[in-house]
Amino acid sequence: MLIVGSFALTLIQFGLGVDVRQFIDYQIKQAGSNAPQLWLDRPEISFYVHRSLSLVVVVLSIWIYKLVIKEGLAQKYIQFIIGCILAEIALGILMYYVDFPWGTQPLHLLIAALLFSAQLYWLFRIKIKPYDLSI
């Protein structure tokens, strides 16, 4: 099921995000908290996978959205999910290219938690009232 696959990718993204965060914490200890331009100077592979996989998550979510529209199903869940994903990507871009502006890291984590919650809620709703979004 496509929605379960999307949820699984989100869980993988969480794990990769934790790795990236641990790397950033280490870089802060090494370079100092006043040198955010150095924190991702030489990122680990997990950063690149995390960044690239986010595009796969967007494409998969848009695909699910198109199937939801085609089937005439409730769109509010997938619209919220796509909104969270786009906000996550925008914050990721800000953190990387603008050297971690104030508040972007906690906001990135908060929206990730909202995304996880929305996807999990949608999965539970589907279990209660199943519908088919198979390929």
Protein language model features and the residues they cover:
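Polytopic transmembrane helical bundles with strong interfacial aromatic enrichment
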Residues: 1-135
